[in-house]
C-alpha cells in the first residue's frame, strides 16, 4: 500500500510507478482522489519506484519521489534452481539469517559463498532457504558444496527442514547432522522424496564454538534423475597388469 500527505488543499493526485530505474513517463499512471493506493500485480522480490503529483485542476505540482520499495519473496517455482551466493544477486534477499546471539553469524562473502566465522561463544545460527514445493522428478533433491577454511579448526553444521515457517522452532526435521566438510569443496546430495507435495524451507544450522570459517556454495534444487550415478568406486588387488574395481549401485539397476 502507498500513502502520502497532501501538499495543501488539493483533492486529486497522479501516481506513477515502475520497476526500479524506469524513466518517468513510461511507467504505469493512475489518477486518484485519495491519499493512498494499493498496487497489485507486482513481481515478487522486485524493487519498484513510485512518484506522486498533486493535480490542482489548472496546474500540477512537481513530482514527489521516487519512493522505492522491494516486494516480498515468493516460492521458488522454476527448476532446476541454483543459488551461487554471488554478491549482488537479488535472490539473496530471499535467504534468511537467524543469529542465536553470538558475535558472528552467516554472511554472504565477497568471494561468492555463504560463510560463517568463528565466535568465542557457541553458534546457534540458521541460514534459511526460500520456500519451494517438492515435486517428484522436478524438485525432490538438493545438492550443494561446502568446505572449511581449516582442517584443525573445522566448523560443522546440521541440515534441517521445515514444512511450516522459518522460525528456528519450525525446523523439526533433520536431514543431516554433524556434517564436517574438508578444506576443499565437497559436494553433498540429499534426497527429499519423503516430502513430495509439501512446501519446505531448508536451514544450515551452525552450533560450533571458536573454530574458524565454514563456506556453503552452489545450492541447487533439482529432480532425482531416473538413472542415478553409481558411487563409492574403489580399486583393489593391484597387480602389474590388472586391478579389481568395485562400486555401489545408484539404485536398482543391474547393468553398468
Model-derived features with residue positions:
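Recognizes extended acidic, P/S/T-rich segments that occur
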Residues: 14-43, 57-62, 174-182
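Extracellular carbohydrate recognition
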Residues: 123-126, 207-224
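Extracellular carbohydrate recognition and processing domains
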Residues: 166-196
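Short beta-strands within extracellular/lumenal beta-sheet-rich domains
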Residues: 120-137, 186-189
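Extracellular glycan-recognition surfaces and repeat-rich motifs
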Residues: 21, 78-123, 253-255
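Extracellular low-complexity, O-glycosylation-prone stalks/linkers
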Residues: 7-29, 161, 252-256
Amino acid at each position: 500500500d502507498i500513502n502520502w500527505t497532501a501538499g495543501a488543499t488539493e483533492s486529486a493526485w497522479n501516481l506513477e510507478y515502475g520497476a526500479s530505474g524506469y524513466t518517468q513517463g513510461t511507467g504505469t499512471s493512475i489518477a486518484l482522489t485519495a491519499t493512498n493506493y494499493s498496487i497489485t500485480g507486482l513481481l515478487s522480490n522486485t524493487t519498484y519506484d513510485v512518484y506522486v503529483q498533486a493535480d490542482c485542476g489548472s496546474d500540477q505540482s512537481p513530482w514527489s519521489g521516487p519512493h522505492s520499495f522491494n516486494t516480498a519473496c515468493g516460492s521458488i517455482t522454476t527448476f532446476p534452481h541454483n543459488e551461487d551466493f554471488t554478491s549482488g544477486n537479488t535472490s539473496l534477499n530471499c535467504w534468511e539469517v537467524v543469529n542465536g546471539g553470538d558475535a558472528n553469524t552467516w554472511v554472504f562473502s565477497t568471494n561468492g559463498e555463504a560463510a560463517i566465522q568463528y565466535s568465542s561463544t557457541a553458534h546457534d545460527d540458521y541460514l534459511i532457504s526460500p520456500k519451494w514445493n517438492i515435486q517428484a522428478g522436478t524438485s525432490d533433491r538438493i545438492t550443494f558444496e561446502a568446505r572449511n577454511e581449516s582442517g584443525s579448526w573445522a566448523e560443522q553444521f546440521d541440515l534441517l527442514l521445515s514444512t511450516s515457517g522459518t522460525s528456528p522452532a519450525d525446523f523439526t526435521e533433520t536431514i543431516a547432522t554433524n556434517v564436517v566438510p574438508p578444506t576443499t569443496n565437497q559436494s553433498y546430495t540429499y534426497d527429499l522424496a519423503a516430502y513430495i507435495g509439501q512446501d519446505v524451507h531448508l536451514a544450515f544450522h551452525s552450533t560450533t564454538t571458536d573454530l574458524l570459517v565454514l563456506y556453503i556454495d552452489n545450492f541447487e534444487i533439482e529432480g532425482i534423475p531416473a538413472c542415478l550415478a553409481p558411487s563409492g568406486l574403489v580399486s583393489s588387488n593391484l597387480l602389474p597388469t590388472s586391478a579389481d574395481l568395485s562400486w555401489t549401485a545408484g539404485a536398482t539397476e543391474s547393468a553398468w
